[in-house]
Amino acid sequence: MQPEQQVMLNQVWAELIIEELVRNGVKHICIAPGSRSTPLTLAASEHALLSIHTHFDERGLGFLALGIAKASNDPVAVIVTSGTAVANLLPSVAESGLTKEKLVLLTADRPVELINCGANQAINQQGIFSSHVCHSLQLPSPSQNVPAQWLLSRLDQACFVQQEQGGAIHINCPFPEPFYGKKDDSLLVDYLAPIQNWKADTSSYIQQTPYFSHVTLSPNWMQTARKKGVVIIGKVSLEEANCAAQLAKELGWPVLADPQSGYYSEWAHYDLWLQNSACFELLSEVECVLQFGARLVSKRLGAWLKNYQQAYYLIDPHSELLNESCHAHVRYRADISTWCQTHADSLADRDCVFDHAPSVHWSESLKVASQNALALARSMACNSETLSELSFALTVGQKANDCDWFVGNSLIVRLLDMTGELNQKNVYTNRGASGIDGLVATAVGVQLANDKPLLALVGDTSLLYDLNSLALLKQATQPMVVVVMNNDGGGIFDLLPVNEKKKDDFYRMPHQLEFSHAAAMFGLSYHRPETLSCAMSMINDGLEKGIHLIEINTPAGQSGEELTRLFQTIQHAALF
C-alpha cells in the first residue's frame, strides 16, 4: 500500500470510530499526548459535537473521564497512545468496572507485526484490562480489505453491550505508520460508497433497542408493607434517594441513608449508635429490609446486615452480585425511582391504612438514639472553634454553601458517615474499588460535567498520590475548593490493633509534608485555617469564586484518640 493511502485509511477509520461513538452518546473525549494515537486525536479534535479535555498523565486522565461519566451518566471516551500509557488507565477502569460508569477506551497500538519483536513502545495490549471491562474489541490495522460496514457494526455492538451492562469497553486500534500527510478523499471513494446512507444520516449504523423490564408490583407486596421494616439507601443518586425515602414515609419505616446518597434522615449516624448493643438489638426487631443501591460506607451497618436473617430485598439497576454477606434475598434489577414510585402508588391506589403502632416505639427510640449519639460526638469535639477532623465533619455539611460534593476515601468519608449532615446534596465518590488514586482528577471530571461549584474533601496521602492532577483544576468551569485533611499520613489506620512503631512504619507512613508549595507550583490559591469558623469562611468564600486548595492540619493520631473515646462512650451510654 502506498504511504498516502495508509495515511488516508488511518484517518478515515479514526473518523468513523469517533463519529459512531458520538452517535452512540459520547459527548466528551479525554486525550493524552502521543504520536501513535494521532489519527484518533485529529478526528476527535475536528468533531463539532465533542467537548475535548486533555491531561499529560494517563492515570489522571482515566479518572478525569470517570468523573465526567459519573456526573453526566453518559459514555466518555479516552484516547491514549501505545505502551504503558494504556496500562496507566487500569485503576480508573477497575473502579468503573465496579461502579458501572461508561468509559470508552480508545488505545492506539503498534500493528501486529511490531508486537513481541523488540519494537519500541510496544506491549501486548490485547486483554490488558481483563475482566474489568464489559467488552473488548481488537481491531485490525486499517485496510481496504476490511469493510467500513464491519467496523461500524463492531463498534455498535460494543456500545450496545456497554449500554446493557455498564462499565468500560476497550477498543484497541493498531495504526501502521505513516500518520501525517495531506488528506485526499478521492483515494477512498469506492471504499466508503457502501456507507453513504449512513454518512447522510445521524443515527448509529446498527440501531438496537435495549431491553427494559417493566416494573411490576412485587409478589405479596401488601403483606410486606405491613411488616416492621427499614429502608437502607446506599450509593444512589439524590433523585433516587428521595424516591426511596418517600416510599419509606408511605410505609412508616425508618431510613438509614449512606452519605453517598446525599440524603439525611432522622435516623442518621447509625455507624455510631449501632455500636451500642441496645440499639443493635432494637434495630434487629425489623422483619423486612428494603435496600436501594449498595457500596455502603458503614462497617457497623454491614455487620448488622450480616447477622440479619429475615426478609431482605435489594433493588439496583445493575446485574452484578451486591450481597457481600451472601444472604438469601430477593433481587430486583430495576430503575430505582420507577420501582419506588410503582410500589408507593400501589399503597395510595388501594387506599391502604396501615396500623403503624407496632413500629412507632422502636422507630422513635432509634430516632432518639441518633440524636443522642450526635450530641455525644459534638461534646467530644471540644468547643466551637476547635479545628479537628471530627469537628470539621460535624460542621461542614451544615455550614458549607450549596454545591456539589466529592468525598475521598480517607478517614473523612467515615467521619461524615458517623457524624455528618449531608442533606439534599449531590455527593460523588469512588467507592467501588475505594482506592486513594485519582481522586482530584475524578472531582474535576464531576465539576466539568455538572458545571456547578464543587467541594472536594481528600486526605493528605490521597493528594500526594494524585498531585499531578492539581494541574487539571485550571480546567474547572466554576469555583472549586479542594480541602486536604492533613494528619501526616494514613490516619484511617489509627484504630488498627497494631503496636505504634509498626503502625507508623507500615501503615500511617508519616511524611511531614505540607502543600503550600504544591499549590504555588500549580497556580492555586492556598489557605491554611487555624479555627473551625475560619475554615468554613474560607470554604464558602472559595465556592463563590476561583480555584482553591485549603489545607487543614491536625496532629497525627488525634482523630484515632477522639474516636476511641467516643466509641467507648457510645457503647456504654443509654441512648434511648
UniProtKB/Swiss-Prot annotation:
- Cross-referenced Gene3D superfamilies, in alphabetical order? 3.40.50.970, TPP-binding domain (3.40.50.1220)
Q: Which cofactor does it need?
A: Mg(2+); Mn(2+); thiamine diphosphate
Annotated SUPFAM superfamilies:
DHS-like NAD/FAD-binding domain (SSF52467), Thiamin diphosphate-binding fold (THDP-binding) (SSF52518)
Cited function: Catalyzes the thiamine diphosphate-dependent decarboxylation of 2-oxoglutarate and the subsequent addition of the resulting succinic semialdehyde-thiamine pyrophosphate anion to isochorismate to yield 2-succinyl-5-enolpyruvyl-6-hydroxy-3-cyclohexene-1-carboxylate (SEPHCHC).
Protein name as annotated: 2-succinyl-5-enolpyruvyl-6-hydroxy-3-cyclohexene-1-carboxylate synthase
Q: Is ATP-binding among this UniProt entry's keywords?
A: no
Member of which family? Belongs to the TPP enzyme family. MenD subfamily.
Self-association and partners: Homodimer.
GO process annotations (BP): menaquinone biosynthetic process
Q: How is the cofactor bound?
A: Binds 1 thiamine pyrophosphate per subunit.
What gene name is listed for this protein?
menD
Gene Ontology MF terms in the entry: 2-succinyl-5-enolpyruvyl-6-hydroxy-3-cyclohexene-1-carboxylic-acid synthase activity; magnesium ion binding; manganese ion binding; thiamine pyrophosphate binding
Q: What is its EC number?
A: 2.2.1.9
As its record notes, the protein acts as a catalyst of:
isochorismate + 2-oxoglutarate + H(+) = 5-enolpyruvoyl-6-hydroxy-2-succinyl-cyclohex-3-ene-1-carboxylate + CO2
Q: Which UniProt keywords apply?
A: Magnesium, Manganese, Menaquinone biosynthesis, Metal-binding, Thiamine pyrophosphate, Transferase
Q: From the UniProt record, give the pathway where this protein acts.
A: Quinol/quinone metabolism; 1,4-dihydroxy-2-naphthoate biosynthesis; 1,4-dihydroxy-2-naphthoate from chorismate: step 2/7; Quinol/quinone metabolism; menaquinone biosynthesis
Q: Which organism is it from?
A: Aliivibrio fischeri (strain ATCC 700601 / ES114)
Question: HAMAP family from the entry?
Answer: MenD
